[in-house]
UniProtKB/Swiss-Prot annotation:
This is Oxysterol-binding protein homolog C23B6.01c. GO terms for biological process: endocytosis; exocytosis; intermembrane lipid transfer; maintenance of cell polarity; piecemeal microautophagy of the nucleus; sterol transport. InterPro entries: OSBP_sf, Oxysterol-bd, Oxysterol-bd_CS. It comes from Schizosaccharomyces pombe (strain 972 / ATCC 24843) (Fission yeast). Residues 404-479 are annotated as: Disordered. Residues 404-418, 470-479 have a biased composition (Basic and acidic residues). Keywords: Cytoplasm, Lipid transport, Lipid-binding, Nucleus, Phosphoprotein, Transport. It comes from the Eukaryota. Residues 439-452 have a biased composition (Polar residues). It is found in: Cytoplasm; Nucleus. One of its GO terms (molecular function) is sterol transfer activity.
Length: 479
């Protein structure tokens, strides 16, 4: 008998939870802004939005070698494939990430190849990629993020600007904001939008998560654009998680390729010219590679995993009282800070990002020229903490041992025959750093079930509770 795929996007809410939701909904009106509505903690994912964004960088093997594809059309499809690869990574049921507070940050990194993966696609990679995000605005909420892999000359800058709306039996998160993927060796930029997120079945039926509406992937230099529809299921017909799209030449409107499939499993691409159909992506054939972060005890009080630690612990334990109390304490402190700034006539300024246009931000850091990839990473780490103390010591030791006195840059001296300037370092990173996962209940490990679906489970490797209690007491007794 064939194995029936589990419906991981649907969720049955217990009667008590349903009553809480109905009590909230009774005070709402259609199309009402939900930004100031306090949701019950049982619908929360134990992870901040700043960390949640890293899901979209969890298939680096689909991005980092893109510049080796010579044909512009095939390279464009490679970028589309990478873009479509991140949506299947999500918690079970209908969960929303924690809303970051103003000034909250999250940083992390990926070291290639991952020592805990046998995926041949990942084993071919080498080097280090870094990520940094900051909540740069609270009204409206704006999360700015940055990704860089110096070895492969790939950079991503983006903002997420969610706008929540009540739609009757559904709640919608309108995901405004644009991501820019830069392939620096080719001087190409890909501008990308996001699908909207819908929570169905708020009043009746099963609660279910759906992605919907149109997104675009556009490359001005190659004159190519993908228009992709994330289809929502109709009341009578249709299927869940389907997509349909096309790739066209912008200047002429000529359709070159058609895209179809399901964003949580298999997708294919058809050439309009030849009629040939080939796989675009099968997510079951690629390991998910989650971000690593510094140990919790090395994080600042406004870094996501440390800030929300008690709330995440309580959410996972289904302790709604503690989750609500700790979450409210953090949000109350944020409101008090806002009042104090108003009294003192102080305008908030992001710490690590700068505004380049209304509601658009990039990292306020200039990548140094003429430096090795490792020196670039060290410079970034000095600007915004990314690596652990153990890794940082290893960085500087490697640099001192591989830098000639007459040349402070190791760019010309440390590359091997493959052109790799960080491989030598990455292979000798301290063993704990190789396998380190974010040491917080907000982190997850990945498990692939027999039916091919990807589930996220809480990482059992937690920091010492006594250390954490001390950290939080020092941060704020109320938290």
């Amino acid at each position: 008998m064939p194995h029936e795929k589990q419906d991981r996007d649907a969720e049955e809410i217990e009667d008590e939870g349903k009553n809480i939701i109905l009590g909230i909904v009774s005070q709402l009106r259609p199309n009402m802004d939900l930004s100031k509505v306090t949701f019950p903690t049982f619908v929360l994912e134990p992870k901040s939005m700043l960390e949640r964004i890293t899901n979209f960088m969890s298939h680096p093997d689909l991005l980092l070698n893109v510049q080796k594809t010579a044909d512009p059309e095939m390279r464009f499809l490679d970028v589309v494939r990478f873009y479509m690869s991140g949506w299947h990574i999500r918690p079970r049921g209908v969960k929303k990430p924690l809303n970051p507070i103003l000034g909250e940050t999250f940083t992390g990194f990926w070291k290639f190849p991952p020592s805990n993966s046998k995926d041949p696609n990942l084993q071919k990679l080498h080097g280090i990629a870094v990520y940094a995000a900051e909540q740069v605005c609270h009204h409206p909420p704006i999360s700015a993020y940055f990704y860089l892999c110096p070895e492969y000359k790939v950079r991503i800058d983006g903002v997420v600007k969610p706008r929540s709306r009540f739609l009757g039996n559904s709640a919608a998160s309108i995901m405004e904001g644009i991501a820019s993927i830069k392939l620096q060796d080719l001087d190409e930029e890909y501008l990308i939008t996001q699908p909207n997120v819908y929570a169905r079945g708020i009043l009746f039926g099963k609660m279910r998560l759906e992605l919907g509406d149109h997104v675009t992937v556009r490359c001005p230099k190659t004159d190519l654009q993908a228009d992709i529809e994330f289809k929502v299921k109709g009341f009578i017909s249709g299927t869940y998680n389907s997509i349909a799209g096309k790739v066209k030449r912008v200047s002429t409107g000529e359709v070159l390729y058609k895209i179809s499939g399901k964003w949580d499993s298999e997708m294919s691409v058809e050439s309009v010219k030849t009629g040939e159909t080939r796989p675009l992506l099968d997510v079951s054939k690629h390991d998910v590679y989650l971000v690593s972060a510094r140990p919790l005890e090395e994080q600042g009080e406004r870094e996501s995993q440390r800030l929300w630690y008690k709330t995440c612990q309580a959410v996972i334990a289904r302790d709604q009282t503690t989750a609500t109390e700790t979450k409210s304490a953090i949000e109350d402190r944020q409101r008090e800070e806002a009042k104090q700034r108003e009294i003192e006539n102080v305008q908030w300024k992001p710490k690590y990002f700068k505004m380049i246009a209304p509601e658009e931000y990039i990292l306020n850091f200039d990548i140094p020229n003429g430096k090795s990839d490792l020196e670039v990473l060290c410079a970034l780490d000095e600007f915004i903490p990314i690596f652990s103390e153990v890794d940082r010591i290893a960085f500087h030791k490697f640099l001192s041992e591989n830098t000639k006195p007459e040349d402070s840059s190791i760019h010309k001296h440390s590359r091997d025959a493959s052109g790799d300037s960080t491989k030598g370092f990455a292979e000798h990173m301290p063993a704990p750093a190789r396998r380190r996962r974010p040491q917080s209940t907000a982190s997850f490990v990945t498990y692939r079930s027999d039916n091919g679906s990807v589930d996220e489970y809480h990482d059992a490797q937690l920091p010492d509770p006594n250390t954490l209690s001390k950290l939080h007491e020092e941060q704020d007794p109320a938290l």
